[in-house]
């Protein structure tokens, strides 16, 4: 597995050093902006104004990062490919990574506030198909699901009631590793027709 140590900024913001990264925009909807930030190594970045919205980060590469925000002591964070983290809105910060390769992060920038209490489906995938769908974490804005199908495995009939961002972590039937899609509500049964396990992450937007 490729390990990199990087510093970078994760969004196009006023008051932020921008040459440390490139942005590959994927989607921009009323609910969210989705993009991949590719961070250059050995380039400390200062965000003077911070970030006004909450975000979900999915790390496409493994690495170690140093973060200094506010008056707190700098802390070191390690992450792995496919790890998902919540990044709350924040004030000014400085991030630093050290390594010899760029690092990529899929970022989901949440534009609105939570919609309030949501209906509960009797066919929720984490209930009727818990073998394949696990809750990574949940809060009032998102629910993050980790999806795993073994080769030739077939799931149960289930329902998705929310829009979701899906990241494919490996090559699988109908998708390549690192493909990103927005998928709407659906009731269906899924099957991995391939000869290898299928891994993906689904971020449901409330």
At which residue positions do the language-model features occur?
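Boundary at the C-terminal end of the N-terminal hydrophobic targeting segment
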Residues: 18-22
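Glycine- and acidic-residue-biased ligand/ion/polar-headgroup-sensing regions
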Residues: 52-70, 159-174
């Amino acid at each position: 597995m490729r390990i990199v140590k990087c510093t970078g900024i994760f969004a196009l913001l006023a008051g932020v050093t921008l040459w440390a990264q490139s942005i590959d925009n994927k989607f921009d909807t009323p609910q969210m902006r989705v993009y991949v930030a590719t961070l250059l190594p050995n380039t400390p970045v200062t965000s003077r104004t911070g970030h006004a919205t909450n975000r979900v980060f999915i790390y496409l590469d493994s690495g170690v990062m140093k973060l200094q925000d506010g008056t707190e002591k700098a802390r070191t964070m390690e992450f792995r490919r496919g790890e998902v983290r919540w990044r709350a809105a924040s004030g000014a910060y400085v991030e630093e990574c050290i390594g010899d390769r760029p690092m990529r992060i899929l970022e989901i920038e949440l534009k609105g506030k939570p919609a309030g209490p949501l209906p509960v489906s009797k066919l929720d995938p984490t209930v009727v198909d818990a073998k394949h769908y696990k809750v990574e974490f949940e809060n009032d804005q998102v629910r993050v699901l980790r999806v795993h199908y073994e080769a030739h495995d077939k799931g149960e009939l289930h329902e998705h009631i929310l829009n979701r961002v899906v990241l494919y972590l490996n090559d699988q039937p109908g998708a390549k590793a690192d493909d990103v899609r927005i998928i709407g509500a659906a009731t269906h049964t899924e099957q991995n027709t391939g000869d290898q396990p299928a891994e993906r992450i689904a971020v449901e937007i409330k």
